[in-house]
Amino acid sequence: MCAAAAAESQHPQGADAGSRVVAYVQGGSIPAVIHPGKLTHINFSFAHITAGRALLDQPGVADDLAKLRALKKQNPKLKVIVSVGGWLADGFSDAALTDSSRRAFARSAIVLLREYTLDGIDLDWEYPGQGVAGIKYRAEDKENFTLLLKTLREELDAESDARGRAGSDRYILTIAAADREYFDHVEMSKLHVYVDWINEMAYDFFNSLTSTTGHQAGLYPSQFSAATDRNGDAAVKQYLAAGVPTAKIVLGVPFYGRGFAGVTPQNNGIKQPYEHYEGDHSYDELVGKYIGKQGFVRYWDEQAQAPYLWNSASRTFISYDDPQSIANKVCYVRERHLGGMMFWDLGSDRDDELLNAIARGCSR
């Protein structure tokens, strides 16, 4: 282990930090056409944890990753990262529990990098110290998550040194992270020094677990917001207050919408009780079946900088992001000198309508 292995990650990876465009892509649903020139990083989702080790053993993984690596022929600066975990993914608490378990997990991640010729590791632990997804958790996850990232940083830096990967080619370590109570269960002011950046999931603010409809990815509060409602700007400020450098905050946007049915028919369905969660819809599905179709009307909340759909006949409300809201977020990222943008996921926008809104940059 080199003496500097545990040092803070001082080198935000990729193209210049403010221009990162990080795409999550799901194994088994790689789009037939990908324009790699619009991306800086692809996070392949997901590796899982079995017996404390990170594994990629799903059918078709090797072919999927070969397709993604082949994109480097068109964009040599593109980085392909493996994301470990995801919603409902268990195993993190045990993997992070002891020094030996952390070391074993980190070394298993190195094995994946070698086997599939990858450029880094992303951890999507949803969530340390919380059992909302039905996963195993412990109170000590809070400290252990920091220690796990420290161990991963050590192992990745040692592997970079051993392979002569320098500068922007050093192995990358990132996490996907949330806001509000998430901060109660992690040591954000400590852990950020070990990662190259944080993929801030600035979405899912309203979902199947919330009691009312609302903007699932609103950038700001609006007249319809309660004081306790979440929004992207408040989330960014929470990271900044914890001492996270602006260049390490990558703002996440959803390429899907969330639908609510049986909604109380007031205020065009926004911030209203609902009878049941109707489901998730990819942006492609929204364009093909919902926006301006079947009685759905698009509305724009100027204060929140967010669109939504309302069908008064079926009493269905859908919150989503579109090119207008994403373009505003691109400007938000630029004006605040954040580290770039991330989205979930590439397969939900096969005509690149949303990705193009990111690629065009800020026009104001």
Regions found by a protein language model. Name each.
Residues 24-39, 97-115, 179-191, 232, ...:
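Short, acidic/polar
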Residues 84, 206-217, 253-332, 358-364:
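Glycan-binding loop/region signatures in secreted carbohydrate-active enzymes
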Residues 11-113, 130, 140, 149-151, ...:
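Glycan-recognition patch characteristic of GH18 chitinases/ENGases
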Residues 44-47, 70-73, 110-118, 153-161, ...:
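Sec-exported extracytoplasmic/periplasmic mature domains
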Residues 18-19, 38-40, 76-80, 117-121, ...:
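Short, well-ordered coil/turn segments that N-cap beta-strands
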Residues 22, 51-62, 128-288:
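Substrate-binding surface in catalytic domains of secreted glycosidases
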Residues 114, 124-157, 161-179, 314-364:
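Active-site and adjacent substrate-binding regions of carbohydrate-active enzymes
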Residues 42, 82, 123, 152, ...:
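Conserved, mostly hydrophobic/aromatic
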